[in-house]
């Protein structure tokens, strides 16, 4: 280690570790500015926050100890309880317990078996809320695919919500295009407005339905809808006549 006494700065190279309060930082290289109370770590960085039960991994981190904020760059990951967030860039506000992930952001909820992909993700850990910014994809229980933008996810309720034009694909190959939606992960229930449903009959045939509002029970494969318009694939009546 190198200690510049006049500047109150410490530089370390190789297998470095900083321990303070309920946090530890390990990395190949560590710099500490004692006056500003700022840590900079590079290469194989791991931050353990024992108070919040959170571990952060990254290529580089800057830890502003006075403000209790961490900024990461490159191959960033935050892990706590049943959740994992990965991105190129992470910001962690320890006091408010808020994570912000930018660029190729992914939030995985292993308990709910759901993964959200977005340009930007903000996770309010205390309230168990996630808000995305920009184009957003979600994969629920490895069965239901969502394409939307500016999505809200209320983890305790199991609600995935968007007021933007969206599409949903179920595990039977049916596609739902909606002006807005609320999906409950626990009940596997989709509610949407101005819904176009493309129901897959087989590989070459699709029935199309329009509902001004619809409630779709994926688990029991049933629905309740208002103002229904039906466009049936052209071979339906031909097949009936041949019977």
Label every PLM stretch briefly.
Residues 1-243:
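Structural signature for solvent-exposed beta-strand/loop edge elements and short helix-capping sites
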